[in-house]
């Protein structure tokens, strides 16, 4: 399984996890990156060159980006967006703060008796972090095998 397949699998897994957990729908994806004039850089969605394996942000859209190469040398751009938050029952929707993703994302706040929804939100955030870390780990393992 190549890096892109692993990332896509985890992103879909997170989306399914969130979908069935009620209240929040994940929004993350991977697409082929454009070719920058400097072969060492990735051409991001913003039209700028970015170093591989380094995050950059669009604070206006509350997005996080990451470029990486798969084992065939093809560059991909991972885009993380805010999940769609839906407040149900006694829960309320709290706007995100200014700053980088994920702090700028809206959040569902529930009364103390509804702790399950809070735990669920943390789990999905951890899945997003693990997806990013796993992508880097797979790349490093493949480099070490060569």
From Swiss-Prot:
Any GO CC annotation of this UniProt entry: extracellular region
Pfam families, per the entry: SVWC (PF15430)
Database matches in InterPro entries: SVWC_dom
Signal peptide annotation: 1-26
GO MF entries: toxin activity
Domain of life from the UniProt record: Eukaryota
Location(s), subcellular: Secreted
Post-translational modification summary for this protein: Contains 4 disulfide bonds.
Family: Belongs to the scoloptoxin-16 family.
Name of the protein in question: U-scoloptoxin(16)-Er1a
Organism encoding this protein: Ethmostigmus rubripes (Giant centipede)
